Structures are given as C-alpha cells and as structure tokens.
Design a protein with these regions (language model features):
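HIT superfamily nucleotide-processing domains
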Residues: 1-151
C-alpha cells in the first residue's frame, strides 16, 4: 500500500467503496462519478502508478478479472457492449496514480462514443512502415519474458 494513494485506502477499507469483486490480487468497485450505470473500476491490490510498471502476472490477473466483471456488468445492466480502458499517465486522463481498468457498460443511443473520441488526429499514413518499425524496435528493447499463469 502506498500511504497517500486513494485507491490503496479504498482497497484497505480505510475509505468506503461499493465493492463488486475481490480476490487475492484484484479489487473492483463502482466509480463514484460514473459515465453510465454500472461503471466499475478494476484495480490491482498491489500499487502500480503506471500500467507499464506492472508485473506480467498481475497484468494477466487484472485483465482476467476485468473480463469476468465486464461480462457480469453487461448482463446486470442489459448492456449491448462496453468501453474497457486504462488512462495511463496524467496526460491521458489518469486522475488517480494507481492502475485501474474502467468497465463502462453501453447501450445504443446512450450518447457515448468509442475509443477514437478520446483523441483523434489525422496521422500521416505514408509513414506507417516507419511507425511500425519504431514500435517493433522499442518492443525488443523493453521485452520481458513470457509468463504462464498457474491454475
């Protein structure tokens, strides 16, 4: 737990929340400023400021929990789909520096939009090969070993 982290305090019970799911590694609770009814935040119990700092095992656990919670939220609210996302870093809209996945149930006509509504610029499509190569090179430099989650 990080001393001044809002989500660490929620996970420890110091600050109340509307918990919907908990296991040894993940805690999920309702967003207090929901984008739609059922908007749930899924967070690792271990404190990570950034998604890219996470251990591979915790990434797998977080996303498996997010998958289960998305299915439950969609069923509970008769949603026709969901936005599932992470704001990674302050510039991307991360308001609490503790990794969390937003699960936002969606219905036709709800007024919401898709992921491209977050930021959209017209990229230069003539340099897609260069862009892809830049990412592949960076992946090789930052690659971690593959992980198999037991059980």
């Amino acid at each position: 737990m990080t001393e001044n982290c809002l989500f660490c305090k929620i996970i420890s019970g110091e600050i109340p929340s509307k918990r919907v799911y908990e296991d040894d590694y993940v805690y999920a609770f309702l967003d207090i400023y929901p984008a739609s009814e059922g908007h749930t935040l899924v967070t690792p119990k271990k404190h990570y400021n950034s998604f890219t700092d996470m251990d591979p095992e915790d990434v797998a656990r977080l996303f498996e929990a997010a998958r289960k919670i998305t299915a439950a939220v969609e069923k509970a609210f008769s949603a026709e789909g969901s936005n599932i996302g992470i704001n990674n870093g302050e510039v991307a809209g991360q308001e609490v520096p503790h990794v969390h996945v937003h699960v936002i149930p969606r219905k036709k006509g709800d007024g919401g939009r898709g992921i491209k509504s977050i930021v959209w610029t017209e990229p230069d499509r003539t340099n897609l090969n260069d862009v892809a190569e830049k990412i592949r090179k960076s992946l090789k430099e930052t690659e971690r070993p593959q992980v198999t989650i037991p059980g």
